């Protein structure tokens, strides 16, 4: 109900439930977003309250390099989001535009960080670093980070440190943060 209430497409929700990418925790009924390694072992989990409270975070022991994702192989590009909900919203929008969301490489960064004072010294997020190491076909990185201060700073940092090797596109949400 929570994800559907957020406007996420029913087919996408069902896919995530069937693949155990999203589960419901008990007794609080939080939505839990799971990331897996290559052996289909869960390595990352983020939770989000499904009620009006803003309780959310990473589960203890989570490894961000395996963050929540919906991946397609050999697409040549990756779409990056601050969180799982943003990723699922984008997949829904693509479906509404008639595009096959299953053919897109969608990855949550599991949050963004403040770049270094000297922006060139900023580091690539572990999630993205691992993905770029594993998938040598990626040439284009599309950033769908929020329009808030943290999202804009992280976008600027990633554009600065990655643009010598990749085409880096800034495509923030048109509405909302």
Question: Which residues does each predicted region cover?
Answer:
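TOPRIM fold recognition
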Residues: 94-177
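Short, well-ordered amphipathic alpha-helices
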Residues: 86-95
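Terminal peptide-recognition signature
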Residues: 3, 33, 82, 90, ...
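Basic, glycine-enriched DNA-binding surface that flanks or lies within the catalytic cores of DNA
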Residues: 1-71
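Short active-site oxyanion
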Residues: 75-79, 140-141
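Flexible, charged surface loops at secondary-structure boundaries
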Residues: 26, 70-75, 133-137
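Conserved mixed alpha/beta catalytic, RNA-binding, or beta-rich assembly cores of soluble enzyme
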Residues: 80-85, 110-114
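Acidic, divalent-metal-coordinating active-site segment for phosphoryl/phosphodiester hydrolysis
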Residues: 85-86, 154
């Amino acid at each position: 109900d929570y994800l559907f209430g957020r406007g996420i497409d029913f087919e996408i929700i069902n896919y995530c439930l069937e693949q155990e990418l999203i589960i419901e925790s008990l007794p609080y009924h939080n939505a839990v977003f799971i990331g897996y390694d290559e052996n289909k072992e869960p390595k990352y989990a983020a939770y989000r309250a499904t009620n009006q409270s803003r309780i959310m975070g990473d589960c203890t022991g989570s490894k961000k390099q395996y963050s929540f994702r919906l991946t397609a192989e050999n697409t040549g590009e990756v779409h990056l989001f601050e969180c799982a909900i943003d990723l699922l919203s984008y997949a829904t929008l693509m479906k509404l535009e008639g595009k096959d969301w299953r053919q897109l490489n969608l990855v949550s960064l599991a949050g963004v960080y403040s770049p270094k004072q000297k922006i060139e010294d900023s580091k690539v997020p572990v999630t993205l670093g691992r993905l770029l190491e594993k998938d040598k076909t990626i040439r284009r990185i599309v950033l769908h980070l929020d329009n808030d201060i943290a999202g804009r700073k992280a976008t600027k940092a990633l554009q600065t440190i990655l643009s010598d090797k990749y085409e880096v596109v800034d495509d923030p949400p048109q509405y909302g943060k």
